[in-house]
Every structure is written in C-alpha cells, then in structure tokens.
Amino acid sequence: IVLHDHFELAEKYRLAGVHLNGRNPHYRPLSNDYIPTLSRSCHSIEELTDGQRYDYLFLSPIFDSISKKGYRSAFSPEQLTKAGKEGVINERVIALGGITPEKKTAIKDWNFGGIAVLGFLWQEPTIAGVIRQLTRLRND
C-alpha cells in the first residue's frame, strides 16, 4: 500500500511507501528505521530532472485521458523521444494518461519503465472485461 495523504500512517503501519503530489509535495520520515518507497506525480519533463531521489515517478498525461474528458496530452512525440534519448525518461518513469495496448510500442520507444492504466480499465462494466483488458495489455 502506498499513501498519497496522511504519511504518518505509512510509518505507523510500515506500509510500502508514500506518493508525493501537488497537495503533499514533501515527506520527512519521523524516524530513521523506516524508509518507504518514494514516488511522485509529474506533469512536465522538467519535473523529472529532480527524479534521482525517487524510487519511481509518474509522468502524465502522455496521451489524451480516457477517464478525464478534455484532459489532453501534455507532450509531443518529439519531446518524449528527446527526453527518452537523454535518459530523462528512464526505467523509473511510469507513463500515465490515455494508455491502451495500441500505444505500448510508442511508450517503449520513448524509454518509459512501465505504464499505469486507469480509464482503459474503468470503462469496463464487469470484472471479466477488466481481466480481458489487463490480459490484452500484458500480451499485446
């Protein structure tokens, strides 16, 4: 479990980690004997350059959002290609926003370490549909 708020609970219950975002941009451990994974949401390539202190980062929106209508891609393919070649996008950066199986090749070409999927799965009305879509993501 990774918490986006109430970070003191992560330490109290020895949870996996904390996730920083605009609401909660800082984390300071209460003790030295608990080191959680540390992640962050980024919405610009520039934000990734501070990424060395994080275990992983989410960059979004890579493509137009499926679940947030009108939330458009923030990056051109050229920007993502350049950031991937420069190592700014690397194995610790997770692509988020508008992810579908058809876009996995581009995501790999841009050097992302993985994908996070929301709307693509949320649009499925049944558990069987979600499992089918997850299988497509894994196999395609």
Role assignments for model-derived ranges:
Residues 5-29, 37:
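Glycine-rich, small/polar surface segments that engage phosphate groups of diverse ligands
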Residues 37-70:
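Internal catalytic-core helix/loop-beta-alpha segment
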Residues 1-16, 42-55, 84-89, 93-95, ...:
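Catalytic cores of alpha/beta
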Residues 20-30, 58-71, 101-137:
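Glycine-rich phosphate-binding active-site loops on the catalytic face of alpha/beta enzymes
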Residues 1, 33-36:
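Short charge-dense sequence patches
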Residues 140:
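Expand to "…catalyze enediolate/carbanion chemistry for C-C bond making/breaking, isomerization
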Residues 72-81:
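Charged helix-capping and loop-helix junction motifs
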Residues 31-34, 86-88:
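Short, conserved loop/helix-junction motifs that constitute active-site signature segments
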